[in-house]
Amino acid sequence: MLKRLQVKNFRCLEDIDLPLGPLTAIVGPNGAGKTTILRAIDLVLGDVWPSLRSFRIPQDFINFDTTRAIEITVHFDPPYTQGSFNITAFRLTCKGEDADFHVDLEPLDEGGNVPRYPSGNPLRVGTDMRNHARVLFLDHRRNLAQHLPSIRGSILGRLLQPVRREFKLQDNFKQVYEQAMDLLRTEQVKQIEKTIAETAKQMLGFLGKDAMKSMEIGFGFADPANPFNSLRLQYRESDLTLPGDELGLGIQSAIVVGIFEAFRQLGEKIGTVIIEEPEMYLHPQAQRYFYRLLCEMADKDQCQIIYSTHSPIFADVNRFEALRLVRKDRDDRVVVSYVREEDKSALDNVRNRFKLGGRFDTARNEVLFAKRALLVEGYGDRVAALQLFNQLEVDPDAECIAVVDCGGKAGIELIVGVCKALDIPFVVVHDEDVWPIDERADEETRRKQEQENKAEQEKNQRIQACAGAERVFVVQPSLEAALGIGRNASDKPYRIAEILKTVDVGQPPDALRPFVEAIRQVTRPMEE
């Protein structure tokens, strides 16, 4: 598994150092450097051996400055052992002057040094050594040709390795061509084919059941003399058969998801897979399916998944340990923010207190793509915020402000922790939810009210402690009460919106002033 990436002077990456986990989601705005990070890993460990032809000179040098050497170091674990040497990283450099450039790929030991033999000669990176940490890179094009068995290191190539051994036992292939195709379709081939076809059809289900009935996805062999290197996925509809790589990118993407599902079901280990924008060409339901599939494969140690994304489905605040937020600072340098090891335990405790239902709302993940965030307690509060933005003549989308329904106060704690770890500026507004005790009630009811008030006070204190008092605005006792809406009223969001339309935001009622001030603050420039 890859553990760490260091990049210097490659394209827009002047100097970054980021940890890599079993599942790593690289998020950030367009042009921040997400794809460059993936390309850096692919240069060192991808399908093509790195050489001078791997680089564009001077375009791949930062600011086109060829005097600053490109250096990409990828660390991995477990180490590769060769004799007495333990190799834990590879370093790729491209440097030179006066048009005399050269590229070096060097192995590094635990101390970050190139090991040397007793003779003084340095250890060199060989094919076996590089294959120890090799990665499979899937770019945004989703071309099925990337996955065919003829492509070195492809997913289907790895899936079919045991099938090749099984097929070698069939010694009459050359004698009877008519029987050859049946012989090629061993039980494992059939199982792989079935899984890919069923998953792809599931991904394409939005076309309708009638369309699915006339569609088949399966294997075809382009060259019977070299069956498994020429195996390809075919798409059959009515009497028409087409190679999979001739189809639209949406169908090809669905078939790619099917290939991953086949790997998951067979329990095979892939190594490290790098995916550029896994959401590409998939509708939302298919995106959620693919995301769960990737998470399960990473959780079960079938493979390491590293991907870039613009989708709130694939950027999940509940998996905060996987997030790497890439942005440019005021000096136009790329910086990467992530949850540090020392903060993970506290955030994990908050996550465990989070309401289960709130964990499945991908809308709150939009906070990861915002320049600033207004964190509110629930859906009604979000409706109120959007209505007040409108009355203040501020477009939150145009200002890249996320209005986030956190799903309760525990959710606010979680999102605040993630925002702080990733340096996302934020403001919080929530209800106090501390109500006067009804002295006319019986003792048991009063005791229950006191316990509820105490619990809310503790929640409020935790929010203020984690967010900072200057970022927290509290409506007393609640937004509904401030607007004259009963605690048990029905259709609260609609009532909130209708009443707020009549509010003068220039001179709001005192009870509503904290909410308006929170919105005013989040619209101002804020320090990260």
UniProtKB/Swiss-Prot annotation:
Effect of mutating R487E: Loss of exonuclease, reduced nicking activity
Result, substituting D433A: No change in exonuclease or nicking activity. Loss of exonuclease but not nicking. Loss of exonuclease and nicking
Annotated phenotype, changing H140Q: 2.4-fold decrease in ATPase
Entry's family note: Belongs to the class 1 OLD nuclease family.
Annotated gene: old
Cofactor binding remark: Probably binds 2 metal cations. In vitro during a short incubation, Mn(2+) is most efficient on linear or supercoiled dsDNA, nicks but only poorly digests dsDNA with Co(2+), Ni(2+) or Zn(2+). When purified from E.coli Ca(2+) and Mg(2+) are the most abundant metals.
Region Toprim domain: start-end pairs: 370-528
Outcome following mutation: R487A: Reduced exonuclease, reduced nicking activity
CDD domains per record: TOPRIM_OLD
Effect of E480A: No change in exonuclease or nicking activity. Loss of exonuclease but not nicking. Loss of exonuclease and nicking
Residues covered by region (Dimerization domain): 154-245
Protein name stated in the entry: OLD nuclease
Superkingdom, taxonomy of origin: Bacteria
Temperature-related activity annotation: Optimum temperature is 65 degrees Celsius for the ATPase activity.
Catalyses which reaction(s): Exonucleolytic cleavage in the 5'- to 3'-direction to yield nucleoside 5'-phosphates
Subunit architecture: Homodimer.
Region (Disordered): 440-461
One annotated GO molecular function: ATP binding
Sequence positions that bind a divalent metal cation 2: D381, S478, E480
